[in-house]
Amino acid sequence: MHEGKITQIIGPVVDVDFVDGQLPSIMDALIVERPDGTELVLETQQHLGEERVRTIAMEATEGLVRGMKVVNTKNPIQTPVGENVLGRMLNVVGKPIDGLGEVHATKTYSIHRPSPAFDELSTKAEMFETGIKVIDLLEPYSRGGKTGLFGGAGVGKTVLIMELINNIAKQQSGYSVFAGVGERTREGNDLWEEMKESGVIDKTALVFGQMNEPPGARARVALTALSIAEYFRDEENRDVLLFVDNIFRFTQAGSEVSALLGRMPSAVGYQPTLATEMGALQERIVSTKKGSITSVQAIYVPADDLTDPAPATTFTHLDATTVLSRSIAELGIYPAVDPLDSTSRILDPNIIGRDHYDTAQAVKQILQRYKDLQDIIAILGMDELSDEDKLLVARARKVQRFLSQPFFVAEQFTGLEGKYVRLEDTIKAFKEIIEGRHDSLPENAFYLVGTIEDAIKKAKQLQNA
């Protein structure tokens, strides 16, 4: 057993001396026993000279003093994996935080693992249905792909990710892993209670390192969740869903400790290793010939600036992007997805079919034309438009409102019953609106409804009111 002692503590960064010169390897976990008998895990980050290592603490360092004994485990942080973690809530080091006792797992995985070899990867492109109209029509998600939900503060990223968990976990009987990275503890608790109520919890593992945790935990918790998902993919040959809320906090945690580790800051004060750290995480979230990991990641956009290095670095790894816009949220359209900014790699007639592709392009064209005309409308008013443009604007406004949808997870806020809309119903409805079959209906009828039948029903109610 190789032992060292603490020589310096600066916030979450702890220096440890190993006098025998047998230094732990980079990424090895070290354990400090506190006076109250609890254990604190440190992760080795740097070798400073022949006897000293610099580490990051996975929990708060209150109560640590110089001279305390540190034990080298000679392994990276290990997390329990397998069926026994389903229905449980863990922290970054794989310890349960749900008060339900120990996790009796037969196997553990290191949180740092190599990404699968190139020849093991699967390249099959296939869409999966989410039941959310704007996503299924305009930026379809691919099975085994990576999707990002981009948005500033308070535009609905977490609500959208919770709705996706609700729809996908209920519709598809696969396993899900949820990583709560540096977000609100209240939201994590709401998710836990909601999953227990809906019965989805038995097929879900939750791993949390929330806002109140030190940066060490927030920088590693996504890797812990990923290792659990990799086990189901590689050893049980399953299709797994991985939800991460919020991947920006992973980057933020790295930047918090970067200067303390002696690295020169890069653009906007981020760590110089930003692209490397993001790549190491994202390259593991892939589909192999054994099974797939389909990931949905919420990405906070600082000050609504998509060119900020953190969201910009994440963009390059994604197959589909759903951009949430404050200007659309201000119109009261939820989900506040920007249909013109959002993209998908599989929006291709050879993958999703010609009918779906043509409808999606027609919707984008009509919305783009409406956007171009908005300046003219603002200055001169609607009366100055040609009859053709007036009709186009009327249809575009209906399309815009029909892209909104009542969510199951927001029922208590909206008072409206949540709707899951099948892809064929979505395509049919938008096709009919663009062809002008519903020109006689008021645009209010299209707001916060599910299918086109719901809109027709709402129009009748509005007429009778």
Swiss-Prot record:
Gene that produces this protein: atpD
Function text: Produces ATP from ADP in the presence of a proton gradient across the membrane. The catalytic sites are hosted primarily by the beta subunits.
HAMAP family: ATP_synth_beta_bact (MF_01347)
Membrane topology value: Peripheral membrane protein
GO cellular component terms, A-Z: plasma membrane; proton-transporting ATP synthase complex
Organism: Chloroherpeton thalassium (strain ATCC 35110 / GB-78)
Source species taxonomy: Bacteria, Pseudomonadati, Chlorobiota, Chlorobiia, Chlorobiales
GO molecular function, one term: ATP hydrolysis activity
Annotated family: Belongs to the ATPase alpha/beta chains family.
CDD domains the record matches: ATP-synt_F1_beta_C (cd18110), ATP-synt_F1_beta_N (cd18115), F1-ATPase_beta_CD (cd01133)
Catalytic activity: ATP + H2O + 4 H(+)(in) = ADP + phosphate + 5 H(+)(out)
Enzyme class, spelled out: translocase
Compartmental location: Cell inner membrane
PROSITE patterns with a match to the protein in the record: ATPASE_ALPHA_BETA
Sites where the protein binds ATP: G151, G152, A153, G154, V155, G156, K157, T158
Keywords assigned: ATP synthesis, ATP-binding, Cell inner membrane, Cell membrane, CF(1), Hydrogen ion transport, Ion transport, Membrane, Nucleotide-binding, Translocase, Transport
Identification of the protein by name: ATP synthase subunit beta
